[in-house]
C-alpha cells in the first residue's frame, strides 16, 4: 500500500489566510489571494468553520503570528485599499487569464468572509 499525505481544505485555506494577514501589504504572492478566493467559491459550503478556525490558530501559533489575528479585518482594509496591491493584482490578472474577470474587491471580500467564518466558529 502507498500512504498519501494531504492537507485538508481548512488547513490549506488557513495557511494562505495567515500569510495574507501576517504579511499584509508586503505580500506580493497574488496566487495566495487567488487560491483563497477560488477555493472558497468552489468549496465554500464544505468548509467546517470550527476546523478552519482551529487550523488558523494552529498555523499562527506555529509561525509566531498570533498577534496579527485580532486586527485581521483592519489588515484586510489596508490591503484592499493599497494602490500597490491593486497594481499587483492587475498585473496578475494580465498574466493569468483565469483571474481576469475577478475584481480585487471580490477577492478581498473572500478573504474577509473566511476570517469572519473563523470568528463565528
What are the residue ranges of the model-derived segments?
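Structured mid-to-C-terminal alpha-helical surface segments
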Residues: 1-121
Amino acid at each position: 500500500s502507498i500512504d498519501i499525505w494531504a492537507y485538508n481544505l481548512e488547513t490549506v485555506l488557513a495557511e494562505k489566510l495567515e500569510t495574507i494577514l501576517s504579511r499584509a501589504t508586503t505580500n506580493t504572492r497574488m496566487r495566495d489571494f487567488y487560491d483563497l478566493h477560488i477555493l472558497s467559491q468552489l468549496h465554500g459550503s464544505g468548509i467546517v468553520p470550527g476546523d478552519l478556525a482551529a487550523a488558523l490558530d494552529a498555523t499562527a501559533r506555529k509561525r509566531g503570528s498570533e498577534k496579527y489575528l485580532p486586527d485581521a479585518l483592519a489588515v484586510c482594509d489596508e490591503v484592499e485599499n493599497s494602490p500597490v496591491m491593486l497594481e499587483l493584482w492587475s498585473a496578475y490578472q494580465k498574466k493569468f487569464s483565469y483571474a481576469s474577470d475577478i475584481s480585487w474587491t471580490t477577492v478581498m471580500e473572500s478573504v474577509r468572509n473566511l476570517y469572519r467564518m473563523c470568528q463565528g466558529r
